[in-house]
């Protein structure tokens, strides 16, 4: 497993990438249902998957919750092969059809989290991109294995992208109440759906003013 979270590599990448992203993403609006959990255990951000941008959107969430901690993102091995440089930014490749691949990824993450228990792990249990209004979301059970084996605080995260009155979309991110690491995939899926529905309801109420009306911080 050649992945690692290299802070110099992340800083160099983001020096160029974040300005590029700002020209293509109008804003990332984040709201939290509760203050962040204590940093004595890892965080697992379990989110729906609506776009190529989602990992970078959740990087903004991680900056707010644990800005100085490493962040690891679980990605399909096939997708990671297209962007091998992501390995230096903590991206871990997994082939869901291969128990050995899953076991190696878990072993790598457990070792890294023992070194830095305040780390964050990003996981997209759908395994592929779907629109935010899809119901059910279709979470795979692998998220249960990662949450339990990593002994993590689990945060359900709903993501929705909306163009509003700008060319570039605004990402609305709703982070729910923390859950125990023994959570079932079905319950986690329901909680993420609840967060997405809250975003969609907010957009239905506020329309093009949603970006300005969004309750940044703890709601």
Task: Indicate where each model-derived feature is located.
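Surface-exposed cleft-lining segments at the edges of enzyme active sites
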Residues: 91-98, 129-134
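Short glycine-enriched loops at secondary-structure junctions
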Residues: 51, 75-80, 159-163
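Non-catalytic C-terminal accessory region of glycerolipid acyltransferases
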Residues: 2-5, 103-219
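Structural motif
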Residues: 44-46, 93, 120-124
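Generic beta-sheet signal
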Residues: 74-76, 94-96, 157
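Membrane-anchoring hydrophobic helices of lipid-metabolizing enzymes
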Residues: 1-59, 70-71, 81-91, 110, ...
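Short helix-capping segments at alpha-helix termini
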Residues: 64-67
């Amino acid at each position: 497993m050649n992945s690692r979270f290299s802070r110099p590599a992340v800083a160099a990448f983001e020096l160029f990438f974040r300005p590029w992203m700002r020209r293509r993403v109008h804003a990332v609006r984040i709201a939290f249902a509760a203050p962040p959990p204590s940093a004595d255990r890892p965080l697992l951000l379990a989110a729906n998957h609506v776009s190529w941008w989602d990992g970078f959107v959740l990087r903004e969430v991680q900056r707010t919750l644990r800005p100085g901690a490493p962040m690891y993102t679980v990605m399909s091995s096939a997708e990671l092969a297209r962007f091998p440089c992501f390995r230096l930014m903590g991206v871990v490749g997994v082939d869901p059809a291969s128990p050995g691949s899953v076991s190696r990824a878990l072993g790598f993450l457990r070792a890294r989290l023992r070194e830095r228990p305040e780390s964050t792990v990003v996981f997209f249990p759908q395994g592929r991109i779907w629109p935010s209004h899809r119901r059910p979301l279709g979470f795979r059970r692998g998220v249960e294995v990662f949450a339990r084996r990593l002994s993590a605080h689990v945060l359900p995260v709903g993501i929705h992208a909306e163009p509003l009155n700008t060319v570039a979309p605004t990402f609305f991110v709703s982070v729910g109440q923390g859950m125990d690491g023994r959570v079932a995939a079905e319950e986690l899926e329901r909680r993420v759906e609840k967060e997405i529905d809250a975003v969609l309801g907010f957009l239905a109420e506020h329309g093009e003013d949603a970006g300005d009306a969004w309750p940044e911080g703890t709601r």
